[in-house]
Amino acid sequence: MNKNTWIIGFTLFAMFFGAGNLIFPPNLGLESGQYFWPSILAFALTGIGLPLLGVIVGALDKQGYIGSLNKISPKFSIIFLIIIYLTIGPLFAIPRTASTSFEMTVTPIANTNSNLALFIFTVIYFLIVLYLCINPSRMVDRIGSLLTPLLLITILAMIVKGFVDYGSNSHSQATDAFTSNFSGFSQGFTNGYLTMDAIAAIAFSMIVVNAVKATGVTHANKIFKQTLMAGIIAAVALMFIYISLGYIGNHMAVSQEKIASLTANDQNIGTYLLTTMASVGFGTFGKYLLGIIVALACLTTACGLVVAVSEYFHRIFPRISYKIYVIIFTLISFILANQGLNSVITMSVPVLSIVYPIAITSVLLILLARFVPTKPIAQQIPVAIVSIVSILSMIHTQGWIKLSFIDSLPLKSYSLEWFPIAIVTTIIGYIVAAMVKKQKPIVYEKE
């Protein structure tokens, strides 16, 4: 591995080391109890492995996922990318940055979680976002480049102190959702959806590919290998942090009365665990410092997402100006952020339960076609069937329409019913492709 590989690896790490995602591992650790290891490893699979795989697969075509998804279907490519940008933008990810910032700063410092306090905070937060995005400058990037190492140092200090403070404690008791190693795995797997990093990787993979090209690597195979090695570096670093935070959360003593109180006050348990770690480890100053760093890091993330989503929509629908998109997406994010962190997370679950299976299936199909060439129909069949099953399963799970056959699907009780279907339909797709003579084989464009 050369110097550039390490640089790109830590660039990848910085992209996925989001302040907003730090709340999930401790919460999973607390809830998983004796099933911690299968839960956290499954979380790492969807929260780290899939995002990095997504970036690596994005390097297969010179146009990134725009080119790769177009091979499946141009209409599917546009619709799916729009859904992804809305998901990682104004519908869920951007509002979550604001509500997380609120619960990491105002709630522990002012000891309030009121709707009025949240409203005032989000007004100020999104006015700053609006100003910085309408008048984009390098300032946000510079602040972000300073905050990432500062946040990393703070988290590492918390981890070391957390092991000292909680490492000798017995593990927590698993909640009702965790009844076996396999249920722990499935819970961790679907909890990893909440990071939204795998679908973000589809949107931003070209940033990494261009960073690799900037080092002088231009051959397609070398770009793929360089991105793969950089991805391994980022994965190891992220796994250490997520597993460590999860392990500490797994050994924190939180009474049922406290959990009931947090739930009654609509306060997120993950943010409570993080602020408690900081407070116990470093006192009031540590709690305040962590909150401020996380809030600023979330702010820079929000700015980056608003700019990226606005630029994307302006590119595909140019009649509306970039600034109008910024205003629209900032306003939507402001409205949704005022529902509170738990509500934002809850609202995202049905959408992510549809988007993630489609995204995972698409990424794996693109990767498979790289090594086992085929025709578009081989990808179209599994993507279409997985999309239909995921939508119907979500409708059934939410109780909107009862579809009894959904419960009989393999792995439905673990929210993985789409996976065997993806495997079977991929095999069928390849068989059909071998019989179809009119379609040309998929060829990913290289430099």
Swiss-Prot record:
Record GO cellular component, one term: plasma membrane
Protein name: Putative branched-chain amino acid carrier protein SSP1343
Lineage: Bacteria, Bacillati, Bacillota, Bacilli, Bacillales
Membrane-spanning residues: 6-26, 40-60, 74-94, 116-136, 143-163, 192-212, 228-248, 289-309, 324-344, 349-369, 381-401, 416-436
Localization (cell): Cell membrane
Pfam families, A to Z: Branch_AA_trans
Alphabetical list of Gene3D superfamilies matching this protein: Amino acid/polyamine transporter I
Gene Ontology BP, a term: L-leucine transport
PANTHER family hit by this protein: BRANCHED-CHAIN AMINO ACID CARRIER PROTEIN SAOUHSC_01411-RELATED, BRANCHED-CHAIN AMINO ACID TRANSPORT SYSTEM 2 CARRIER PROTEIN
Keyword field: Amino-acid transport, Cell membrane, Membrane, Transmembrane, Transmembrane helix, Transport
Principal location listed in the UniProt entry: membrane
Family: Belongs to the branched chain amino acid transporter family.
Membrane topology recorded in Swiss-Prot or TrEMBL: Multi-pass membrane protein
Species per Swiss-Prot/TrEMBL record: Staphylococcus saprophyticus subsp. saprophyticus (strain ATCC 15305 / DSM 20229 / NCIMB 8711 / NCTC 7292 / S-41)
Entry keyword annotation includes Transmembrane: yes
Job of this protein: Component of the transport system for branched-chain amino acids (leucine, isoleucine and valine), which is coupled to a proton motive force.
GO MF term set: L-isoleucine transmembrane transporter activity; L-leucine transmembrane transporter activity; L-valine transmembrane transporter activity
